[in-house]
Amino acid sequence: MAKVDTGKNFENEIRKSLKKINCFWFRIQDTNDVSRFVKQAIAEKQPADFMAVYKGVPILLECKTSKRETSFPLYYSRTRAIPKHQVEAAQKIEKNGGKAFFLLRKDKPRAKRVFAVSYQTIQKFYRGKRKSVKWEQIEKEGIELTA
């Protein structure tokens, strides 16, 4: 049985949603996709999955999924689930008048839910030195997106 890449599926769903909105957007190529053509050492880390402009406001979007039922992991072993360079890129966008959101999807088979969470909230989660965040807290601090 082939492994399903839920992250790529989520990105494709976001791509379809962006096509329905009257905005300019583009998909930022993943570093690992580029590294086939460029040496790994010089392939730059990408700031997010999508860049959009809506009503004149630049918007940075990064998609993350989790199959955990009770919480969203902030770390996988010792690696951050949301790398520092992505949080820093979100901060730069906001300092320059844009908006940045991390789209967190609870990947439960019959109850998929997506929340847009600001970079400030993500930073707060990491400053709390926790390994994960309860979905209830994400529900309170994020914006639930519907189809």
PLM regions and their residue ranges:
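Acidic-basic catalytic patches of nuclease active cores, encompassing PD-(D/E)XK
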Residues: 1-43
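Short, conserved beta-strand edge motifs with alternating hydrophobic and charged residues
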Residues: 26-28, 60-63, 103
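Short, solvent-exposed loop/turn segments at secondary-structure junctions
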Residues: 33-36, 68-72, 110
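Beta-rich catalytic cores
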Residues: 46
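Conserved catalytic cores of phosphodiester-cleaving nucleases, focusing on short active-site segments
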Residues: 50-52, 57-68
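Mg2+/Mn2+-dependent nuclease catalytic core
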Residues: 66-89
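Nucleic-acid nuclease catalytic cores
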Residues: 88-122
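Charged phosphate-binding loop/patch that engages nucleotide di/tri-phosphates or the phosphate backbone
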Residues: 130-147
